[in-house]
């Protein structure tokens, strides 16, 4: 029984988003044992994330400028948010905590991937003005980077910004921005549809 539980928890930690929806659905089952098992597993997942996040927050308090701890905490919160476990009051506060951590990380690391993660959160929360600031900054710092250009494209599509997309197409052609074949095909298919 203990081994079975340990294996199940290991699977849940490896792919929580795939399993959380099933566990939440199982909580509505008519079988009391299934409901109990699903509830216990969800509680265990919450506990695991909470403990990990709290430990990392404590470490960060002791070493506030440690980029590795900050990255681990960002990843833990990112995983927690993606898991589907966040609900209620945490549904609003967790993304804000994540944004605050990403802002801190951007100030220390100045890496494109962190700006894109921050921009992704602004996009998800519908914070267009802040997203625009991120895109403008990346345009100055990394205008030729494929990762930036793909994110810029995704943001423009998500916002339904036709004028922005026209400028995007013109800019990547003028600058001759390298895009992988896969990304080029996706962008070209959208261009044809527009």
Question: PLM features: what roles do these ranges have?
Answer:
Residues 1, 21-31, 59-61, 105, ...:
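Alpha-solenoid HEAT/Armadillo-like helical repeat scaffolds in large eukaryotic proteins
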Residues 2, 27-34, 66, 111, ...:
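Short inter-helical turns and helix N-cap capping residues of alpha-solenoid HEAT/ARM repeat scaffolds
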Residues 3-14, 25, 36-44, 117-121, ...:
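Structural detector for internal amphipathic alpha-helices that build alpha-solenoid repeat scaffolds
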Residues 3-4, 15, 70, 77, ...:
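TPR repeat positional signature
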Residues 7-8, 23, 43, 57, ...:
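Conserved small-residue packing positions in alpha-helical repeats and bundles
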Residues 16-27, 50-55, 114, 128-134:
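Amphipathic alpha-helical scaffolding segments comprising HEAT/armadillo-like alpha-solenoid repeats
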Residues 32, 36, 43, 62-85, ...:
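Amphipathic alpha-helical repeat scaffolds of TPR domains
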Residues 81-194:
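Long, non-transmembrane cytosolic or organellar matrix-exposed soluble domains/tails
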């Amino acid at each position: 029984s203990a081994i079975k539980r340990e294996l199940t928890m290991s699977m849940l930690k490896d792919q929580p988003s795939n399993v959380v929806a099933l566990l939440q659905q199982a909580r509505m089952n008519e079988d009391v044992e299934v409901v109990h098992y699903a509830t216990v597993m969800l509680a265990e997942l919450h506990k695991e994330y909470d403990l990990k996040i709290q430990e990392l927050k404590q470490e960060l308090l002791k070493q506030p400028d440690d980029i590795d701890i900050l990255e681990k905490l960002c990843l833990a919160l990112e995983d927690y948010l993606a898991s589907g476990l966040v609900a209620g009051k945490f549904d609003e506060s967790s993304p804000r905590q994540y944004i605050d951590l990403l802002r801190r990380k951007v100030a220390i690391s100045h890496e494109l991937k962190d700006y894109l993660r921050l921009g992704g959160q602004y996009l998800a929360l519908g914070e267009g003005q802040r997203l625009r600031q991120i895109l403008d900054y990346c345009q100055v710092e990394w205008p030729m980077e494929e990762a930036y250009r793909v994110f810029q494209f995704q943001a423009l599509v998500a916002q339904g910004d036709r004028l922005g997309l026209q400028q995007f197409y013109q800019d990547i052609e003028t600058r001759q921005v390298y895009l992988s074949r896969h990304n080029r095909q996706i962008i070209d298919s959208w261009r044809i549809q527009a």
